[in-house]
């Protein structure tokens, strides 16, 4: 782990200072052992030292309520933007490649200049909840063996969180992403809960695998989203969700229930080539743009009570399971069943 100010690898001044060739005074920060070409320190002292370093950083990057009040109302403070950064929040922190062997608690942190957690390994719970990321946040290619907790956080700049392996549950409820977010090629081995979250920048969550339930209910996608090529082994829940931009969900496989009921699709939506193996529900949905469900396999599908202002196409789609419900629906933009069949 390293902290650094912009354009330099060394930051805080104080005891143990080193003088650079340019005459600047710098101090090296303690590093976490990564196991790459190094002799590991004594295991009886390494973990307590690492925990102490991490605890010290946490204390100094924690935000405080701007107008007082209890910290237990963290979500309310963050929603209002009423927080004051910690004394070290202006530094850049680089934890890349670190192995955390015990529970990590970095909740309620304010990362003002950037934080890099790429390539990290978390053996126990990683609690990064209720945090503010004012600059780019990097979490790529990390492995979480225990719970990963990101809920109630605010990402004000780009988020890089692709290629991760989540072996425990993921809690990312009520999180706000204000810039571009990359969650592609992730594997979620336990439940993933992203309910009531908001995305305002482009989201790329393509190529992900969800081994357990994936819950995106009541989310707001105020941007174009790419969720193409994903595999859902258990229920995929997108109920009461608002898609304000173009939604790319083509080529996905849903091996259990797929629930999109009461959602709103304001832009064009592409489900083409997707396979729905179990109950599929679009009950009460509002489709303002075009909807492409061509070349799909739909099992026990229901569009009951939905409205389509744009054209919808089922060209070459296979309907199976004996139940295909379109009752009380409105198709103002036309509907195309060319080459579709019920099996």
Regions from the PLM with identified roles:
Residues 1-343:
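N-terminal leader/targeting and pre-domain segments
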């Amino acid at each position: 782990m390293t902290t650094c100010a912009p354009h330099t690898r060394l930051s805080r001044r104080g005891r143990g200072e080193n003088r650079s060739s340019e005459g600047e005074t710098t101090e090296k920060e303690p590093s976490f052992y990564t196991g790459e070409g190094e002799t590991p320190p004594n295991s009886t002292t390494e973990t307590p030292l690492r925990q102490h370093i991490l605890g010290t950083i946490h204390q100094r990057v924690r935000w405080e309520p701007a107008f007082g009040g209890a910290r237990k109302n963290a979500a309310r403070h963050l929603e209002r933007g009423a927080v004051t950064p910690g004394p070290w929040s202006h530094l850049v922190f680089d934890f890349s490649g670190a192995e955390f062997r015990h529970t990590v608690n970095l909740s309620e942190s304010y990362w003002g200049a950037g934080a890099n957690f790429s390539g990290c390994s978390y053996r126990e719970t990683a609690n990064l909840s209720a945090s503010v990321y004012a600059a780019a946040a990097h979490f790529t290619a990390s492995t979480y063996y225990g719970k990963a907790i990101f809920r109630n956080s605010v990402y004000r700049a780009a988020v890089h969180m692709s290629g991760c392996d989540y072996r425990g549950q993921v809690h990312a409820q009520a999180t706000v992403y204000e810039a571009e977010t990359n969650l592609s090629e992730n594997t979620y081995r336990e439940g993933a809960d992203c309910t009531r979250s908001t995305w305002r920048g482009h989201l790329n969550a393509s190529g992900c695998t969800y081994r357990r339930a994936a819950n995106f209910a009541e989310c707001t996608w105020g941007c174009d989203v790419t969720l193409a090529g994903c595999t859902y082994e258990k229920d995929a829940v997108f109920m009461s969700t608002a898609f304000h931009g173009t939604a790319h969900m083509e080529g996905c496989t849903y091996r259990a229930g797929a629930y999109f009921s009461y959602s709103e699709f304001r832009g064009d939506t592409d489900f083409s080539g997707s396979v729905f193996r179990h109950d599929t529900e679009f009950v009460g949905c509002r489709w303002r743009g075009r909807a492409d469900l061509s070349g799909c396999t739909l099992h026990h599908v229901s569009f009951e009570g939905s409205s389509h202002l744009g054209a919808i196409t089922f060209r070459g789609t296979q309907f199976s399971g004996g139940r295909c419900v379109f009752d009380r629906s409105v198709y103002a933009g036309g509907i195309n069943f060319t080459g579709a069949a019920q099996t």
